[in-house]
């Protein structure tokens, strides 16, 4: 079907989002067209504002509007424990359960040789620099329970074993192949509680 150019561009823009195929993009485009103009403008401003004003924390890699982020700046948090996650959304999922009080390190990915992603392509070197601080006594590996997440956890575990830092892996209360961001607070809490030493 041939659409007027503005609709075609809107559909193409929606299709750039993950999980949005042609049919969903058409539905979203027509939904946006049916919205009040002020609501559409607010939505557009929110997108631009987020893109312009958010950055990654220079310490942990979490998404933030200040640097360092509010988690790294919080002196009430346990500075001796770092929880390593793959993505900023994983930090948000962990924070929702309100049981973990340490710091984080966001890798921004996982080792995936099939996709050409090696240890140097994610934030493992930054993690190693952070761990030179004698204050850190435990690292919790909370990468996703899929092949890439497990490979990443094993790689980090082998790197850190000689350091004497306590290493643990969150328990598999999480479904294999699942992502942290989709887990509910109870499941995440149990997984953190049942973490195992590596």
From Swiss-Prot:
GO molecular function: DNA binding; zinc ion binding
Signal sequence segment: none
Toprim domain location: 80-175
Coiled coil location: none
UniProt keyword annotation of DNA damage present: yes
GO biological process terms, semicolon-separated: DNA recombination; DNA repair
UniProt keyword Transcription regulation, yes or no: no
Sorted UniProt keywords: DNA damage, DNA recombination, DNA repair, Metal-binding, Zinc, Zinc-finger
Zn-finger region bounds: C4-type: 57-72
PROSITE patterns reported for this sequence: RECR (PS01300), TOPRIM (PS50880)
Family stated for the protein in its record: Belongs to the RecR family.
Alphabetical list of HAMAP family matching this protein: RecR (MF_00017)
UniProt function note: May play a role in DNA repair. It seems to be involved in an RecBC-independent recombinational process of DNA repair. It may act with RecF and RecO.
Annotated NCBIfam families: recR (TIGR00615)
Descriptive protein name: Recombination protein RecR
Native source organism of the sequence: Bacillus pumilus (strain SAFR-032)
Lineage, opening ranks: Bacteria, Bacillati, Bacillota, Bacilli, Bacillales
